[in-house]
Design a protein with these regions (language model features):
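C-terminal motif of bacterial Sec signal peptides marking the signal peptidase cleavage site
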Residues: 25-28
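Bacterial signal peptide processing site
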Residues: 30-33
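Post-signal-peptide N-terminal segment of Sec-exported extracytoplasmic proteins
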Residues: 49-85
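Long, charged/polar, surface-exposed segments that mediate recognition or autoinhibition
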Residues: 96-164
Length: 202
């Protein structure tokens, strides 16, 4: 079993394409979305669970310790270039089951104090190929829109207009939690979980 190189992992982050699309910095023309964010925050609902008992507010050391324990159990492995953690979602997955195997890469987002303030994820079908029309990223995002409601219950995902037809996006707001995902290319869907109180200074 390949063991995680946590020392090296601590120096790298998942490459995340930061698109020039609106929901990373809301503008006045998106007032409906802004109202939604504020209304959900006003409910007082708090969501700290991220994945595998990793939670908002934990330290970077906590993150590495939990990943190490999961790796020893054979539940996760080292991602490409040791820049992330790899978890394979299949029909027996406790995260959510999928008949088509899905590779999920994830890595914590940390603030200046090295506390967890979010999570980055990247999904792709394990059997993806350019000619496999049923395993493209648009199919995957549609599947994730429903399957992710199991580990992250609450409101449904809604379409978010990025003004970029090549990178359609969806977003889900529950209390102080925002989950947004977008199509990176024909293979990958990227996702980020964040705290709206921190993100938008609410």
């Amino acid at each position: 079993m390949m063991m995680l190189n946590l020392k090296k992992l601590s120096r790298v982050k998942i490459p995340l394409l930061i698109l020039a699309f609106g929901f990373l910095s809301l503008t006045a023309c998106q007032s409906d979305f802004t109202k939604l964010v504020k209304a959900e925050a006003a409910t007082g609902e708090k969501y700290t669970d991220l994945i595998f008992n990793i939670k908002m507010g934990q330290t970077q050391k906590d993150f590495y310790t939990q990943c190490w324990e999961l790796n020893k159990k054979g539940l996760i492995s080292q991602g490409p270039g040791n820049q992330s953690v790899l978890y394979v979602i299949d029909s027996t997955s406790t995260f959510f089951p999928s008949d088509n195997k899905i590779d999920m890469l994830f890595y914590g987002v940390f603030d200046d104090k090295k506390n967890i303030v979010g999570m980055k994820m990247k999904f792709s079908y394990a059997a993806w190929a350019p000619w496999n029309e049923d395993l493209q990223s648009d199919d995957l995002m549609n599947q994730l829109s429903s399957d992710l409601l199991a580990p992250y219950p609450g409101n449904n995902f809604i379409d978010f207009d990025t003004k970029d037809e090549a990178h359609p996006a969806k977003v889900k707001i529950d209390g102080d939690r925002q989950i947004h995902m977008f199509i990176l290319d024909s293979r990958y869907v990227e996702l980020r979980i964040e705290n709206t109180l921190l993100k938008y200074n609410l």
